[in-house]
Structure formats: C-alpha cells, structure tokens
Amino acid sequence: MASSQLAPEKYTELLNEFISQYPNSADGYLRRANNQIFQSKEASSMDEVAADMDKALEVAQKKDDAYFNRAKLIYGYQLDKPEKTYKDWTYDRALDEVRKAIAIEALPVYIQLEGDIQFAKKDYAAALASYEKVNDSNIASPATFFRAAKTKELMEAAPEEVLALMDSCMARFVQPYSEEAAPYLLERAQMRLNAGQGRGAMLDYDEYYKAVRGNVNDVFYYYREQAAVQAKQFQRALDDLAKAIELNPKELTYFSELAVVNIRVGRNEEAIKVLKDALEIDSKYAEAYRLIGVAQLQLKQNKEACASFAKAKELGDPNVDALIEKHCK
C-alpha cells in the first residue's frame, strides 16, 4: 500500500478497500489515520483519525505497537503546532501512550520516542535519562548520541561532557567521513569552538569540507576563520576571510573581521585598506570608522584615530565611547 505514488484521495480509497477486506488488521487503520491527519486537521477529520487509532488498538495483536504508533502520531501532531489542540492530543497524552507501550515491552525505539517527547516538553533531565538507555541498546547510532549531546548542552552541562557524547557520535562513522557525517561534524566543530578548543574545531571544519567535497558557502569560511583565530592560525584565518568575501562581497561583517585579524598580526595599513573597501559599500558603516581608529592608534596616528572615533560616534557606534575616553581626552 505505497502512498508516495498516489494522490491522497486515491490512497484513501485503497485503504478503505484494504480495511473492508482485512477488518482485523491494525495496519490498515494506522495507515488510514496517518493519511487522514496528513490531509486535514479539522475537528471532524480528527474524530475519524482518533476512531481509527482506537480501532487499531482494539484489533492489534501487539498492543505495545499500537500504543507506540498512537504516541508517535500525537507527538507529530503537536510538533506541527496546531492552532487549537484536538481534545487531549497533547505531549502529555503522547507520553502516556508510549509509556503504556514500554510497560508491555521496553523496546529501545519506544524509549527513544519517550525521550523525544520529553525533549519537546523541555524536560531535559528526563529526556537525557531516556536517551542514555537508548545509547546502551542495540539501536544506538550517531543520531541518538547527538540527541543526548544536544540535551546536555541545553541543560548547560560542562562542555567536556557534551563533547564526550559528540565524540561517541562521531566514533560511529567510518573515516574518511561521508556526507552523512557532515552535519554532525559541523555541530561538533561549533561545540569545540564554544568550548575554546579552536584547533579541534578547525580540524572538524576541515573534515566537513572534505565530506561535502568542498561544496560550502561564505558562512562556512567565516566560522572556520573563527576557529583558526582561536587556534592562532592567523594566515589560515586571513585566507578563509578572503574566500568568504569572494563568495559574498557585500557582507560587511567579513570586512570587519578581516580588519580585526590584520590588526592582531600587526598589518595595520592592510586593515585600514580593507575597512575603506567596506566604506565603499556602505559609507555609514560606523564599525569601520572605529576599527580604522584602532589601526591608526597602532600606527601612532593619534590625531587621525580620534577623528575616526568621532565619526564612528556620529554614526552611532555603541562601542566607541571607551576608546574616546581613553585616547582622545
């Protein structure tokens, strides 16, 4: 009963015919309920969905499977954020249903859904407890370790604890990494960056680049540049910012960042040149004037620096007052 090649109405006809021929098969009622909720979430349609789920439970040989499927349907319904919730189709109801399934047989896939529902309810401690059980089971996967890592992150656990779970996630992939591993590499890179592990983050970005065969955008180069700066790999940072600007030549943030890195390595004239290029794009870009002033201070051009700071203040830069107070009074 494949639905992907059929219009929903045609699929409904096929399901009705199947149910009339096999009235004691839970599968027909489950499929019809899913098809119906896909087409409409009006109250009358939802009555039909609920009736089919009740019937599926009534005829099911495996009651746990029926409870699980009802929990999954209610969970999916709530994830779509209905304007008005149908009867008691809440996350709490979904949790109650999946726990009925678990009480019959504690399959890891049921416990995973329990964790997902608790995560949606923002009950992160309970979600983590469920995910940890799944990660000790035969269905542990990169995705399940990633869920646990994100949950720990939201619980504001120590970065080392979060990264330990991400390491377990990545350990389930074979190297060289495929495109399937790419999203997880990106996540770990960002986590490493946030934890101050710039070199590790940079290496993850490098692996991501290889996994997606170089199919990256300007934002990728911007993030990898931040990792390179943290790792004190300044030439790599400069190269990545140049690439980001090449791909998105109107993004002023990249010009500012390129100037900051140039100032950091003592290339103050180059920083001023970059910032003047930014002002060609937007003459009212206040941050550019502030950073020009910083570079001019490094070049002992204090009078010019104060004029640049004054221009930044005139244009509304929120961070220039302290510099004026320190250098221009």
Regions found by a protein language model. Name each.
Residues 21, 59, 103-104, 136-137, ...:
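Structural marker of alpha-solenoid helical repeat scaffolds
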Residues 294, 298-329:
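Terminal, low-structured helical/coil segments at or just beyond the last alpha-helical repeat
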Residues 26-27, 63-65, 108-109, 141-143, ...:
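Helix-start (N-cap) detector for alpha-helical repeat units in TPR-like alpha-solenoids
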Residues 1-47, 51, 58, 65, ...:
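N-terminal leader/linker segments that initiate helical-solenoid repeat arrays
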Residues 38, 76-77, 120, 151-155, ...:
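Register position in tetratricopeptide repeats
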